[in-house]
A protein has these predicted regions:
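Short acidic linear motifs
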Residues: 1-491
């Protein structure tokens, strides 16, 4: 049977996952409670403002929160709790993902087994004081000194992956706080999630930025429970005051742009100045030696050639493509190219092609999201591989999925803007007997534009309810079904 047009719907906690061939919709019902803007307007904050931030290094607090060095018994109890949960669901033939405590990440606050959640979170309760302190710190520096690393691609950052798990614990703490009506604690935890994302923006690696985005994303997804809680203050101005964007990725993008030359530093020496044959023999030998550990990462094309004869065969085969690129694409004079050693032509072509395609990809990150939509650097990379062959090896290995990373950044900003719009709607409801507006233009507090399109969000009002949706980013679309809260449909 042809299922090419089939739509599949599954549920993950409060979110419906609606999958179709064209897009993936994440939909949540939000039972909105009326709440006017805070008075004074900036009395509620998430990330502290510049006056209140403390000069200091949040990385110290995060490492202390992740360290169970003095908490051996607590760590073992926490792990035993996890093992017991897995054993229980496996004995019943259920999916291990449904085991406690992980299932609590999909459980509404009102449905949590409170005593068990309190017991589990008690094993890591020491973390909260460090996260409180991290929130107040202006900077975050893990002191990597990455520019001095001999093998930056092999640099391990396990503490960053551990922060993702820390964020999951924070989500459980948030849900428990909502269940226990500890609203200020819930807001503090939400703020800490956002601060983790913003602090990880100071890292040199895109993967660290993406973990930061994931931490903030968990916080934003949880924050809808605040919008559903009558006692929760309005967060409109607190969201408006956040850094824009929360995770810029500028530092990591700058480092990733140079990563190929940081890993293989000898490529920085490759230029148009003629070098003797002995220079290129040494260059190839050093490069082949460095690439020996890269067989599983895409550089096997060089590693496989262990003898000078095999290397000469590879370089000879790559020469025509490199020469064509240098002369036809870059406009170098043919006689000058032909005067260079064959190996120099190949690696010069490799460097210049990499630089050109790299910048064609990275430059788009300096444009607003809607202006990037008409470009497709990936297609140019694939066309270059077909046209020039082996000299595209640096591009194959070192050009990260920059566009996908940029989409993740845009999606986080979109979610924050959706949440800010929700808070503007709460303010409207407070002045209109709990009713939603028919149009976003009726709002007293202006709804932000969708950061993905720089246009107003999609908003459809019908019969007292509404649907608020963002534009599709990387085939993912967020939809919020807005229902005025009545007794029994809020946390």
């Amino acid at each position: 049977m042809d299922t090419s047009t089939e739509t599949v719907t599954t549920r993950n906690g409060e979110w419906l996952h609606i999958s179709s061939p064209r897009q993936y919709i994440l939909q949540r019902q939000v039972n909105l409670t009326p709440q006017a803007e805070a008075k004074p307007a900036l009395s509620v904050t998430l990330i502290p403002n510049e006056f209140d931030l403390i000069d200091g290094n949040a990385a110290v607090q995060y490492m202390q929160a992740l360290a169970f060095a003095e908490q051996h018994n607590a760590l073992e109890q926490l792990r035993e709790f996890q093992r017991k949960g897995r054993r229980e669901v496996e004995a019943g033939g259920e999916d291990p993902s449904q085991a406690e405590p992980n299932i609590w990440l999909e459980t509404a606050p009102s449905d949590l087994p409170l005593e068990r959640v309190r017991a589990y979170l008690g094993y890591s309760s020491f973390q909260t004081r460090y996260l409180d302190e991290a929130l107040k710190r202006r900077g975050c520096d893990f002191d990597r000194n990455i520019r001095e690393a001999k093998d930056p691609v092999g640099y391990l950052i396990p503490e960053i992956q551990m922060m993702r798990e820390l964020s999951r614990l924070q989500s459980m703490r948030f849900r428990l706080a909502i269940a226990e009506a500890r609203i200020q604690d819930a807001i503090q935890i939400f703020a800490q999630q956002l601060a983790m994302g913003h602090h990880l923006d100071e890292e040199d690696f895109i993967v660290s930025n993406l973990v930061g985005i994931a931490c903030a994303d968990i916080g934003v997804s949880d924050a809808y429970y605040l919008s559903e809680t009558a006692a929760a203050p309005n967060l409109y101005w607190a969201i408006a005051a956040l850094p824009q964007p929360l995770v810029s990725m500028r530092r990591a993008l700058a480092y990733e742009r140079e990563l190929a030359f940081e890993q293989f530093k000898q490529f920085r020496e490759v230029d148009e100045i003629p070098q003797p044959a002995i220079y290129w023999q040494r260059f190839v030998a050093e490069l082949a030696e460095e690439a020996k550990d890269w067989s599983d990462t895409g550089f096997g094309e060089l590693e496989e050639f262990e003898t000078p004869a095999a290397q000469a065969m590879l370089i000879g085969a790559a020469y025509p493509g490199a020469k064509f690129f240098l002369t036809e694409e870059l406009g170098m004079e043919s006689d000058k190219v032909e005067a260079l050693p064959v190996t120099q032509v190949v690696f010069l072509g490799m460097r210049r092609l990499y630089e050109q395609l790299r910048d064609d990809s990275f430059k788009l990150q300096y444009l607003p999201s809607p202006q990037r939509a008409g470009f497709s650097p990936y297609q140019a990379e694939m066309a270059a591989k077909d046209k020039y062959g082996w000299i595209t090896v640096l591009n194959n290995l070192f050009l990260p999925a920059v566009q996908a990373a940029g989409s993740a950044r845009d999606r986080l900003q979109q979610q924050l803007a959706l949440l800010q719009t929700i808070e503007a709607l709460r303010d409207h409801m407070a002045a209109h007997d709990g009713r939603l507006p028919e149009l976003l233009s009726e709002l007293r507090l202006p709804a932000p534009n969708d950061p993905v399109t720089l246009q107003p969000f999609e908003y459809v009002y019908e019969a007292g309810q509404a649907k608020l949706a963002g534009a599709v980013t990387n085939a993912i679309k967020y939809e919020l079904v807005l229902v005025p809260a009545v007794e029994g449909n809020s946390p």
